[in-house]
Amino acid sequence: MTMLAVARLAKRLGSARRPGGFVPMNLLYQDLTTMAWWVPPARRHIWFRCTGGELGAHERGESVPHPGLVFAAASDKTWRVWAVKGCDRPSEATPLFQAPYFNVYGTGAICQGNVDVPTGGFAGSVADRIEAWNKAFFDSFFTHPNTQGPLVNYKGGPYRFWRDMLDGRHAVFPESALVPLGTSLAQVLDRRGPDGG
């Protein structure tokens, strides 16, 4: 290849559109295949579809307080969620808790049974991708506990907990109900990978 050809190629490659964009404040971690983000505690709508009517109806939804959450999504559609305490943005040392939701395994893996998982891999802006994953989670129906261990520390268990939440018995999310996992954000993202196991 001549020097002129190298210069032309370099100019064309240099003018090609580069991926990028503003980094949202809630993005916690990103590499070539995984991104993790924080969703601050807030009041959000949640939907349940339980065949036994354990929550007072076969299908029920209400706006309830939620804890802070850390989600991790990978390009292979691996998708996980953990809970965190407090309102501060998580750091590497932040302890993680079992996400108190039905359809979430003890590893944080989210059962994708009725969920419209975002398509397009990691295309689009980071903010758009985060919004798509959040929408997929909060717009789905939660149907049954999936974890082998305790989902919540709550008298009466997970069905009683969510029935009380849906009935408006807690003005703020009761963080005392969160089950500690004995691991930190850095441990699940760095040492063991985004799958937490």
Q: For each predicted feature, which ranges?
A:
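Compact alpha/beta protein-protein interaction domains typified by the UBC
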Residues: 1-121
